[in-house]
């Protein structure tokens, strides 16, 4: 089964994915990692977080899986460039993991479940299956109900509503973060620990880059959704883009995407 991304695939968004690092997106799980662990990263994307995890558990093996061939190829190239040898990448489906039961000491996912929506529980159960007894699963997903826009205006609020409808139409659930404790518990995990962090665009360069990502969506897949669903015309689209250009250049602008983080254990 092909798993859709929570956003349209644009060059700007792909570049943004490569900026993600274990030191931030996986900070909540780093204290639990030990050298020699066998770790799986489900929905690894371009692998930049995976490589950071591999550094923490070396010489233990780390496997990154993703349904996107381009992501896997990108991850492999970065691993070679950084000379990280205890990591491997492969294409795989999050619902039918190609591993035996009790294979891994730890499993990690960052913003995978937003893509899977109500099937996230199926993936969580597969993750439970491949974990060793006593192993843990660390899940981190966004919750768009808690998005913070610095220098927000009414147009940005309107964009948020449209963006939510678009994701919903694609089968994505961008408010799934708050449901992670329930998902992990129903999949069989115990003793869950919950924390919250945010992916923030706060410096002028990252703010302008984030505005550019949104503009590229408005010129691509989101444009079609708006027009097809009579949510706006070409004038409205132009107005949105002009607002994001101005927002991206304003000194008070920032963006924070709040994420819920949950670690759960498989009983020994």
Where are these regions (language model features)?
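Class I SAM-dependent methyltransferase Rossmann-like catalytic core
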Residues: 1-22
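C-terminal helical/coil "lid" or tail adjacent to the Rossmann-like core of SAM-dependent
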Residues: 3, 11, 193-254
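Conserved alpha-helix/loop element of class I SAM-dependent methyltransferases that forms part
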Residues: 19-37, 52, 56
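Class I SAM-dependent methyltransferase SAM/SAH-binding core
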Residues: 40, 46-96, 121-122
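A short SAM/SAH-binding and catalytic strip from SAM-dependent methyltransferases
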Residues: 105-120
């Amino acid at each position: 089964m092909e798993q859709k991304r929570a956003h349209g695939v644009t060059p700007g968004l792909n570049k943004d994915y490569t900026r993600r690092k274990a030191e931030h997106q996986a900070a909540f799980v780093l204290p639990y990692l030990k050298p020699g662990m066998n770790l799986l990263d489900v929905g690894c994307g371009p692998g930049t977080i995976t490589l950071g995890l591999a550094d923490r558990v070396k010489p233990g093996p780390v496997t990154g899986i993703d349904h996107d061939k381009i992501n896997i190829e990108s991850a492999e190239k970065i691993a070679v460039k950084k000379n990280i040898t205890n990591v491997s990448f492969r294409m795989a489906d999050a619902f039918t993991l190609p591993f035996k039961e009790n294979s891994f000491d730890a499993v990690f996912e960052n913003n995978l479940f937003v893509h899977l929506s109500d099937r996230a529980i199926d993936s969580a159960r597969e993750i439970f299956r491949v974990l060793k007894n006593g192993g843990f699963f660390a899940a981190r997903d966004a919750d768009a109900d808690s998005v913070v826009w610095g220098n927000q205006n009414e147009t940005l609020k309107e964009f948020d509503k449209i963006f939510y409808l678009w994701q919903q139409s694609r089968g994505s659930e961008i408010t799934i973060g708050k449901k992670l404790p329930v998902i992990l518990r129903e999949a069989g995990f115990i003793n869950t620990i919950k924390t919250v962090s945010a992916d923030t665009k706060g410096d002028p360069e990252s703010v302008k880059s984030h505005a550019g990502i949104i503009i590229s969506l408005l010129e691509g897949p989101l444009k079609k959704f708006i027009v097809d669903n009579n949510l706006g015309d070409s004038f409205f689209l132009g107005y949105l883009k002009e607002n994001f250009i101005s927002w991206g250049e304003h000194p008070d602008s920032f963006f924070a995407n709040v994420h819920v983080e949950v670690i759960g254990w498989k009983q020994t």
